[in-house]
From Swiss-Prot:
NCBIfam families named in the record: PRK04966.1
Protein name in the entry: UPF0270 protein ETA_31870
A Pfam family per the record: UPF0270
HAMAP family per the UniProt record, alphabetical: UPF0270 (MF_00690)
Source organism, top-level taxon: Bacteria
Family, similarity comment: Belongs to the UPF0270 family.
Length: 72
């Protein structure tokens, strides 16, 4: 189920995004990015609709995933 992220408290949304970013592991790119930069990137992707915030009833967890990978 897609969670309407705009309806979440901003602090809750920030916590969910930070948790997601920290789970994603280490960047191996040329330049390391700060947590704040990564959070801003995910927030931008949510705003553009590129990614969605998803609740999994099976796993009882929240995840952020590309819109194209989400299946009802």
């Amino acid at each position: 189920m897609i969670i309407p992220w705009k309806e979440l408290d901003p602090a809750t949304l920030d916590s969910l995004i930070e948790s997601f970013v920290l789970r994603e592991g280490t960047d191996y790119g040329e330049h390391e990015r700060s947590l704040e930069q990564k959070v801003a990137d995910v927030r931008r992707q949510l705003s553009s609709g590129e990614v969605v915030l998803v609740w999994s009833e099976l796993h009882e967890s929240v995840n952020i995933m590309p819109r194209g990978q989400f299946h009802d």
